[in-house]
Amino acid sequence: MPSLSLMAAGNDPSGLAVAPGAVWVTDEFAGTVSRIDPGTAAVAETIHVGDRAAGVAVVRGAVWVVVHPLSGHRGGTLRIVAAIPRLDSIDPGRAHMPFPPQLLGMTNDGLVTLRHTGGSEGTQLVPDLAVSLPSPTYQGRSYRFQLRRGIRYSTGEPVRPGDFRRAIQRDFTVGSAGALFFSDIVGAAGCTRHPRRCDLSKGIAVDDAAGTVTFRLRQPDPEFLYKLTLTFAFAVPAGTPDHDVGRRPVPATGPYLIYRYEPGHELVLRRNPRFHEWSRAAQPGGNPDQIVWRFGVHPDAAVAAIERGSADWGLFAFPFSPPGDRLEEIRTQYAGQVHVNPLPETEFFALHNRVPPFDDVRVRQALNEAIDRNVLVSLYGGPGLARPACQVLPPGLPGYQPYCPYTLDPRPDGAYTTPRLALARRLVSASHTAGMRVRVLTDPGFAPATYIVSVLRALGYRASLWTASGGRFRALSSNSRYQVQISRGGWAAAYPAPSDFIDPLLSCGAFRPASDANGNAAQFCDHRIDQDIQRAWRLQSSDPQAAGRAWASVDRLIAGQAPWLPTVNLSAVDFLSKRTGGYQFHPQWGILLDQLWVTHYRAGAASPASP
């Protein structure tokens, strides 16, 4: 008898029943029941049942299918108001801040993803466009994926194995920040040196006939599957340009497509007619028929729009938030509509370790001792949005253990109390650097930077602000050629792992001299700490608990060397309208917009009224 594979009947078989001359298999998310000929192992017939086919049984020759009804919350328009002036990009290879997972995670897909649900389960890896999660082979240096069958882009073009190699090659070609995540793929070093000639055919082998993608790495990477969840690894079809797509989105695979994008004004998502739900864990069908996102709305106007019901959701996080006292009023008055959640993010100033006076560890430690982090909490929006930070890792990440050596009477619980200005002045005196000119690089209007200037002056430096914005700011802060002394920074975890904070930002390998692509703005390199980083890496796949302890140790060692001036860890405030339900907060992506539902909608409703 031929070998029988349930996958022949669909991507997500949910039930099986055997009858004389037939095997019946249901596929829940395709809404089908299929009859397989056991003699040939071929699908002889497929019947669409209209709802989710959860199981099947054969009773006295009759085939019975158990169905779950489709969501009763589907329909309507979800209206979003955002204070951010614009997205940096809608290109999966270029989008980085501020909302790429929330937005592009609804429109596009990779081989794997995080479970699409709120709470701690949201950190679990699940297959997306791949059939299953592969186990690494060849001592952890190879991963082979089998693609799901029958998935198409919104254009009707099928998703092919080569689309995943194209996506990652394109990261190098377009100068994506995501290229750093894939530097261990065989051939990536050549792509870094010559991006326009990037060829990863040796590192990413594709077989269109078999529907497989095989990654070959130079060395084991226990976080490689996490890296494949990022937008930088989302499939892109042939013909995708080797530059930012601008206003023309990459064709969609997810439940929504970008219907219209007007930078700085509006983005509209509508249902992707080619989408079918292949895995509820990875990419469930959304509830709203349409999602309209308006940009550049003042926080006070956004609050007013939600209050009167002309908008459904606003995210308030530094720097796009009402004043702290107004935020507290909202939390009190609309307690049932407001959700506050910590973000996996650390705000900091990078102290450029190879540029005087911050080439002296005593000066770096002095500034960490001198700042009042309670003042900084108020400047970042108050205790509803910020908490003092003295270390690199934010709360919630594996390996995080509260630690604050830069406070009066350091405590085992890591709590911050007050600064030690007298100690800071003694450290500066010992360094013989008082009186030097120091310029603090920041974007315009950033109040915490003004405060840092005042502290530097109190320590005896001739300090001033240096403002730049956009690409100019990024180049100045990253490229060591410009000899910047201190620059504003901030980092949110791309995936739930401590190495995503430490390795790309503070390892020796992350420092690229005289390069705009340098991720280590502090220019920090401590070879002893680097050895500990490598040890923590090696432990991750074999002993996660020991790895967590190792990362906590690395975090403390880095704090002692003070390459950064950590300031706060941020929280986000989600404010929802009364007609909105189904709130879920994903630990990595934030609010799951596609799982919200809106009540009192009119079928076929068009764009929302302006707030």
Regions found by a protein language model. Name each.
Residues 146, 165, 173-238, 260-262:
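Surface-exposed binding/hinge segments that line
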Residues 80, 425-493, 572:
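Ligand/substrate-recognition segments at binding pockets and active sites
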Residues 206, 365, 377-380, 410-417, ...:
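Extracytoplasmic/peripheral linker and loop segments enriched in polar/acidic and small residues
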Residues 259-270, 292-355, 378-379, 450:
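Extracellular/periplasmic solute-recognition and catalytic clefts
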Residues 81-138, 169, 249-251:
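N-terminal lobe/hinge region of extracytoplasmic solute-binding protein
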Residues 115-120, 220-290, 298-301, 421-422, ...:
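Gly/Pro-rich hinge or "lid" segments in bacterial periplasmic/extracellular proteins
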